[in-house]
Amino acid sequence: MKFRTLGEYYEKLEATSKRLELIDILSKLFKESNAEEIGKICYLLQGRVAPFFEPTEIGMAEAMIAQAVARAFETDKNSVLKLYREKGNFGLAAQSLADRLQTTDHSRKKAVDSSPLTVSEVCSKLLEIANFSGEGTVEKKVGTLSELLKKLDPVSVKHVVNIPLGTLRLGIGGPTVLDSLSLAKHGDKTLRPILEDAYNKTSDLGFVAQTFFKSGIGAVKKTKLIVGKPVRPALAERLPSAEEA
């Protein structure tokens, strides 16, 4: 899947807060996905590049993001920060700059349109940024993100910038994703309990989704506790009275 397509789905998801609509949109997204990328898509929908329990953080604060955006779209850091204050969101500021530059620089727009990056390629670059360490880390992160942004359409730029900042607000939780996976592959939500059981054993939506898409619901049913993947804690049940506690 091209990341541009995922960006378009992000836009649709942002436009609604109704759970049934979110499930419908997500199920259509998942129908367009294959087994190799479905796990990555589930992480990206949560604003992540790995499960929540893994200490994989992109590690870029606003100042570094501003540097990367400025370098990608041929402006200066202060101009980026000013636009951010006007828009109230770094992603929107970056989208505006990308749109402005691609409108005036037709060769850049042609390059972006002719070779759109895939979801896997974008996820790989974000993981690369997250794994940088040691001397020169800041420059490596800024440079790599800048080069990535240059290759994306404006809508994709918006969402990629919001991911490291934790400002990707899609309103999608685990239950919504599980319902959508069942609907996409089975036509209804009846497989949700089986998917949820596997999720509870692994705390890893991407793993569950990939197993489901690659090997089917039978393989999901066989999911066991996995070393390194924590079990999700069960919610406490309310008792009728304090005496029964």
Where are each of the predicted segments found?
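N-terminal nucleic-acid-engaging modules of covalent nucleotidyltransferase systems
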Residues: 1-245
